Amino acid sequence: MGSSKSKPKDPSQRRRSLEPPDSTHHGGFPASQTPNKTAAPDTHRTPSRSFGTVATEPKLFGGFNTSDTVTSPQRAGALAGGVTTFVALYDYESRTETDLSFKKGERLQIVNNTEGDWWLAHSLTTGQTGYIPSNYVAPSDSIQAEEWYFGKITRRESERLLLNPENPRGTFLVRESETTKGAYCLSVSDFDNAKGLNVKHYKIRKLDSGGFYITSRTQFSSLQQLVAYYSKHADGLCHRLTNVCPTSKPQTQGLAKDAWEIPRESLRLEVKLGQGCFGEVWMGTWNGTTRVAIKTLKPGTMSPEAFLQEAQVMKKLRHEKLVQLYAVVSEEPIYIVTEYMSKGSLLDFLKGEMGKYLRLPQLVDMAAQIASGMAYVERMNYVHRDLRAANILVGENLVCKVADFGLARLIEDNEYTARQGAKFPIKWTAPEAALYGRFTIKSDVWSFGILLTELTTKGRVPYPGMVNREVLDQVERGYRMPCPPECPESLHDLMCQCWRKDPEERPTFEYLQAFLEDYFTSTEPPVPAWREPIGLELLLAPEASLWGTGAWLRAEGPRFGEQPQSRMWHGEVSGAPSLIKTVLGHP
């Protein structure tokens, strides 16, 4: 098992304030976390807000809450540059007596930022002092404080956010360029009849004099002025800028300052979400204030001392595609407190009502997210040991996060440690790990290949019809699962690369992430335009679609007797998105 060697480079989460200040600025453990009854989320979605006057746009049907997380640069150490006054990016309600409550837009004087993720601050509005989450603030009058500035998010993540069908045409964000140091990128949602809902990306270049431009004939002294101009004039863009891309409050880094080993009495178990061989998962509340997920382990499952030592390493693993470990109760029965994911385990999601609406683009996107989380685990020299759909959690907007990393090593159950016992996940385990206990990141890659079959078959058990002993024998003899029905050969070929006998010949997670993120631009032949999947929608109801509006009707219309090129849809149709009577997307 490896441990963290350096501070993760991956950004934390955040959002920005929109209104311009003046006229020139603009995881054998049950992973399911879906309760039987609706629970109030710990964070709420902040809707997009118009930038200037928005022209009337036809409404695309379907919709969803936006991603659980949006990344941004870490701001720790900002005081070293002499900045002590920060502005609040979100509302925050105190969770302990030492926390400081504040409202979005409040100005805060930072007293001490040397103690990690929670800074001591003094509100210039209320006059009170207390600890605040550092990823909820940004330096005053900085670009980081702008609501439209999303920092170091990837092109793919920006598209995931902007392809929300509830976003009107012209919804936008500004991010750092992935390819040019010091440059920025303006990402804008667009719509046309050929592509449906799509995203255009414009590089923002920097002048030697310090100004900015997209086209050299129109230059600006600041990014704020650039955004203000293009909110009034398209001037070569696909559309003028209308709404800032909406997002949600980020997770705080930990529950509060010094809230790591917490008393059992501070947790309230409210809704049982699942039960497995080694314990249960509950939705609950910490300190009467904060929604969390709580894993309760059966006594004797693992040594409390070994668990606490491993948890110290696990809590240092921070990435937007890993479920965050918040706190622990280290005396038996051990409690593990993590962030709450509203849609439960990926396995349950695939097999449930929502799974039947997933199409290949969404499945590949989910696989890319998992590969992204595991690429971070790979960079940190860590090993998961139990990667499968049951240990992936799903949140809003089809966000997927890896859970239960590292815990499998600590289990002290004979039916598990024998590696061929009834509780051991043999069908997901690489042969060198199952036979000889050689768990490495390359055995995780093998497991990822099996997870891909779970995705493409909507949760089918791997190696159907085979028992564990037979699977191990057949795999050792060279057997590999055939291509699942309706799975592209190129994706099956990727699975087979993950299942190479020599671990060193298996791809890295970095490669897997890049392959999957670029899958539809680099591996597949063009598909007819009317079959082209063009976006993501979160399933708010079973009948909601996972495709963009026009694409859904063009793709599914023929089976209901409707012509793909028809511009109107009438009547009640089973399986159609919730708004049935609509004009197909027209800008």
Swiss-Prot record:
Catalytic activity annotation: L-tyrosyl-[protein] + ATP = O-phospho-L-tyrosyl-[protein] + ADP + H(+)
Signal sequence, renumbered to the chain: none
Residues in Protein kinase domain copies: 267-520
UniProt KW NAD keyword: no
Entry-linked SMART domains: SH2, SH3, TyrKc
Annotated positions of the Phosphotyrosine modification: Y416
GO MF, any single term: ATP binding
Domain SH2: 148-245
UniProt region (Disordered), positions on chain: 1-58
Enzyme Commission numbers on file: 2.7.10.2
Enzyme class: transferase
SH3 domain: residues covered: 81-142
Swiss-Prot/TrEMBL keywords: ATP-binding, Kinase, Lipoprotein, Myristate, Nucleotide-binding, Oncogene, Phosphoprotein, SH2 domain, SH3 domain, Transferase, Tyrosine-protein kinase
Protein's UniProt keywords contain Transferase: yes
Lipid-acceptor residues (N-myristoyl glycine): G2
Intrachain S-S bonds: none
Pfam families to which the protein is assigned, alphabetical: PK_Tyr_Ser-Thr, SH2, SH3_1
List of catalytic residues: D386
UniProt function note: This phosphoprotein, required for both the initiation and the maintenance of neoplastic transformation, is a protein kinase that catalyzes the phosphorylation of tyrosine residues in vitro.
Protein name as annotated: Tyrosine-protein kinase transforming protein Src
Species this protein is from: Avian sarcoma virus (strain PR2257)
Lineage of source species: Viruses, Riboviria, Pararnavirae, Artverviricota, Revtraviricetes
